[in-house]
């Protein structure tokens, strides 16, 4: 009877582990359709969606927006949060301060060109003082998800 109880306990423990964390790798996040047309990344307990201008062939003053959600895609209030986006394209580096812009949105402006090689590092400091960071390649072409079930969240 003890062996059966241990087996049942072990089985219950395995079942409680759920699906692998691979459901949140960058490739899976890139295949997801985002609410604002940006690129999605995980940062700690949060999802950050980075939206940059896609049609600026030369560097000029352009907006940058980061949307904050939790892993259940529920909006997180941006009030009291602040952030910084570092954009890298070729030899050009641009740092843009982000401030709350309503609802779950932080935004700022800075000079950058829309390039498929554009890379971004986003750092968000939440009202409780915790800072989360994520890396993006926001203008890389999307790769379709070939899973018959679509991207899993």
Each model region followed by its residue ranges:
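Hydrophobic helical h-region of N-terminal Sec-dependent signal peptides
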Residues: 9-13, 17
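Intrinsically disordered, low-complexity terminal tails/loops enriched in metal-binding residues
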Residues: 2-5, 17-153
